[in-house]
Amino acid sequence: MDLVKQESKKKIGILGGTFDPAHRGHVSISKEAKKRFSLDKIIWAITKKNPFKGKSNLNLDKRIKYAKKINKNNLFIKVKYFENKVKSNRTIDLIKYIKRINKNAEIYFIMGADSLINFHKWKNSNLILSICHILVFDRDKYMAKSLNSVSYKKYSNKSIEFIRFKKVNISSSKLRKI
């Protein structure tokens, strides 16, 4: 009898955002997610505009180029822009698209604790939780807020994992002020 070699499921992380600009904090949480959850790759899905924030300072092309530049030695990180293919900037549409082209993959959506605060306002947030794991990384001043948020109270019994690790004291907002 032939033994059929069972292929293990591919594990794909998605870190979405404007990356305005990308920085070592994004790289650090990507490395930590890869290590803790044995992710095969992490896609940095760069969006033109965050629906919860104002206009980006850098144009899209510059943000993509810079994100690729800081990841030239991190071959597991793939910097992508999907909105022209997906025809949407909504996370649910991005996740469905990635699931469609990676049918058997397990998807891990990576976010900072600040993003969880408004997660209940995201389009189809309940559906997002049903089709992927959510990894919430600790972020200065936001962990307590996120644990007390409507989103956490609404979804705490779902697939949300909080990750505490050595913080990198940097943010895109701080960098833009320099």
Model-assigned labels for residue ranges:
Residues 1-178:
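Nucleotidyltransferase catalytic core that binds NTPs
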